[in-house]
Amino acid sequence: MRSFTLLSFVSAALAARPFLNEPDTGIEEIFGDLPAGELPPLDRLVGLPDFDWAARHYLNASSYTFYRNGAAGEFSYRNNLEGFHRLRFRPRVMVDITKVESTMPTTILGHNFSAPFYISPCGRAGLGHADGELGLVGGAGQEGILYIPALRTTRSGEDIANARVDGQVTFQQVYLEHNDTATQEIFDRAKALGHKALVFTVDSAADGNRHRAARYGVGSADTALTYNTWEYYKHLQSMTDLPIIIKGVGTVEDAKLAVEHGAPGIILSNHGSRQLDSSPSGLEVALEIHEEAPEIFTQTEVFADGGVRYGADVLKLLALGVKAVGLGRPFMFANTYGAEGVARAAQLLKHEIAIDAANLGVADLKQINSSFVKLKYNGWYS
């Protein structure tokens, strides 16, 4: 039996208190009188949850719902957010942390980035801002972080590629049908546009059961069932020389299979909780791997996403062995301000990672490990 499971204390927490989409830290008191359809001043937003509040206040209901919605009763959406607060730190003191900011840069598949987080693939950025994905690639370029454009975007692939700053590295997310001709075209196009890797989303074999999205007419009309197998993945690897990261790993068993089939990287993810309610969060999967097969973190590059809103969330995933952390909704909400909003969100998260690491007693982000987190639930719900 596993010695630790996040599910046990998350379920208790959900029964103990109401869910807050973003915590009450005073933003309503400060900006509550702002007319609907207006954004608060960018420089007065102090954390990633503020961008969610701003986007909900600014966007029409259907556009906001497209970004916000989750599967079915959205219990996995809640779990993605709340699970981080159940995992406690073990802070160390009397440590020289004065150079921790200099340890922020990392590599992803050998490419250099300024921080251990990236912009996850999200579609239809044009619902938030007229520049669409240009704001995401622009903000990522300003801050030196990875951006992974979705396969289905508002702006063309050429527009996105042309908006990159000199030397900026991007990966391309893909959905694939069991059609070699169409797949080869997608692969060749991604390479021609200068993307350095492919991110193959495998956790959406069928359409998501999204009640909130259906009410606002922004659900998917796709009723097809997708053919994805490990044998097919091996075949895909023979069709391109770009590395193919697998996005959507939700168990230690599949993480092992990904390693066996030569995946250069895996993303622990439940698709932003938009596909299967009751699916585990990236954090829970990272914990499962840490318990049952920690060697995986050295056999392939492991990334994770889902519910990340704070620097502390990033640190918890890094402590378990995750190399870099993805964020989707926060950057989509930040993109309501365009590239400057995306850059501002990245700056805020970098600052939080640095000061939270310092307060945790982490002198070097490359050296953080599971001794900094308490892997046994202490019975508290908040």
Please provide the spans of the model-predicted regions.
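Fungal secretory targeting signals
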Residues: 1-17
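An N-cap/entry alpha-helix motif that binds or orients negatively charged groups
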Residues: 17-109, 219-220, 228, 368, ...
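Glycine-centered helix-coil hinge/cap
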Residues: 60, 338-339
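Short, conserved beta-strand segments within well-ordered enzyme catalytic domains
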Residues: 88, 105-107, 116-120, 146-148, ...
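Glycine-rich active-site/cofactor-binding loop and its immediate structural neighborhood
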Residues: 112-155
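Alpha/beta enzyme core
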Residues: 138, 163-166, 178-304, 311-335, ...
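A gly/proline- and charged-residue-enriched helix-loop-helix capping module
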Residues: 142-181
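Internal helix-turn-beta structural module
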Residues: 339-366, 373
